[in-house]
Amino acid sequence: MSGAPVVRFAPSPTGSLHVGNARAALFNFLFARKNSGKFMLRMDDTDDERSTVEFAAGIEEDLTWLGLRHDLFARQSDRLAAYEAAAAKLKADGRLYPAYETAAELDRKRKRQMARGLPPVYDRAALALTDEDRAKLEAEGRKPHWRFRLDRVHTAFDDLVQGAVEVDGASLSDPVLIREDGRFLYTLPSVVDDIDFAVTHVIRGSDHITNTGVQIQIIRALGAEPPVYAHYSLLNGPEGKPLSKRDDAARFSLRALRDAGFEPMALNSLLARLGTPDAVEPCLSLDELAARFDISRLGRADIRFDPADLAKVNTACLHLMSYEEAKPRLAALGCDLGEAFWEAIKPNLILFSDAADWARVVEGPVEPVIENPDFAAAAAAALPPEPWDESTWALWTDAVKQATGAKGKALFMPLRLALTGLTHGPELKNLLPLIGRERASARLGGLTR
């Protein structure tokens, strides 16, 4: 397939995006970016009972947060005429036929087939109906749903992830494309959009493989050629269960992760490498991530998303962030204490918002922990005059060691507790010049400063 690729991310605005949806969007975006192609956002909103403008707006907000800006946009609810035209062609060609069974009748058929050891495949009884039969059923108040008549053949395609794939049409029921109330199900609008927008590559989860075999038949029935397909492994939760919009929104929705303070590029970095043999590496640029992206490296086995892994990558991303990148966000938090402050604290950040906590350690008020007042008094007396720099800590602690005889942990931990009120934190050689002599002396004296 020649020319620049066109890919699409096609969410249904019936709920919030979770990390599995984000992975689908990211793969399509990175593939387009790497190959100088177009990334399309398509709202699959034909389910007007469950689709809402609020969910649609939330999807766009989530993608913007991730940095995944679309080049093309479509909304299926605006394209019903195109789907009607495609359905009319399929009806005229005898590929779309009316069926009148109720859900209960179909369920009884399936149970009888399974009881006889047969696969629960629709028996095409509707194809045997005469015009008189159909008229009688409609007079009874029944409205037809419309099924696509599959060719009972093996549909083969070369998948960029799975390799050679075949879907046996004889093992499938003829899919329903139009409901009794005239609304379109997912399949036909998706096919028509892929044709009309010249989508070259469909990149989606492996749960769509069977559906792809069906869609290829519909595409060809409409006189078009199918795109290239890539079906990657599915992303499960940490317990190994598939993610869902309904059940996992509180834990794994993009909104929840954003509200928790995770960096968008940390999530992008993790999702881009999960399911590949490559180590996850923190990355602060989508261009850099796209340059590394190789769709052939995606695996076939389902994988798990663990928030603990995201926390590790988030920390690593913050460690890579320059002061110039951090400066406006520090200012927004009210804790821009300068480049030296940022360089001192960033090795200890898990979330960016932690910077505000370390600013309070520097500026106070800090409630010091004084376990040995005599030691603290000796340390205060040994404080050198300002100005201070990174060498001050070593000079001061040498003086305290000489004055008290303390060394190792017995020397350093009481100083940390007195200066910060904490048992851990950034290196004190970097924090001490930021705290300054006045605050350091006060804290060593047991004062909350």
UniProtKB/Swiss-Prot annotation:
Keyword Thylakoid listed: no
Cellular localization per UniProt: Cytoplasm
Pfam families: Anticodon_2, tRNA-synt_1c
UniProt-listed Gene3D superfamilies: 1.10.10.350, HUPs
Keyword Isomerase: no
Catalytic activities: tRNA(Glu) + L-glutamate + ATP = L-glutamyl-tRNA(Glu) + AMP + diphosphate
Listed GO MF terms: ATP binding; glutamate-tRNA ligase activity; tRNA binding
GO annotation, cellular component aspect: cytoplasm
Keywords annotated in UniProt: Aminoacyl-tRNA synthetase, ATP-binding, Cytoplasm, Ligase, Nucleotide-binding, Protein biosynthesis
Motif range ('KMSKS' region): 242-246
Highest taxon, organism lineage: Bacteria
Main location: cytoplasm
Motif ('HIGH' region): 11-21
Residues that coordinate or bind ATP: 245
Enzyme Commission identifier(s): 6.1.1.17
Stretches assigned to coiled coil: none
Any one of the GO BP annotations: glutamyl-tRNA aminoacylation
Enzyme class, UniProt record, top EC level: ligase
UniProt family annotation: Belongs to the class-I aminoacyl-tRNA synthetase family. Glutamate--tRNA ligase type 1 subfamily.
Matches recorded under PANTHER family: GLUTAMATE--TRNA LIGASE, GLUTAMATE--TRNA LIGASE, MITOCHONDRIAL-RELATED
Subunit structure: Monomer.
Function (record text): Catalyzes the attachment of glutamate to tRNA(Glu) in a two-step reaction: glutamate is first activated by ATP to form Glu-AMP and then transferred to the acceptor end of tRNA(Glu).
Name the UniProt record assigns to this protein: Glutamate--tRNA ligase 1
Naturally occurring in which organism (per UniProt): Parvibaculum lavamentivorans (strain DS-1 / DSM 13023 / NCIMB 13966)
Phylogenetic classification of the source organism: Bacteria, Pseudomonadati, Pseudomonadota, Alphaproteobacteria, Hyphomicrobiales
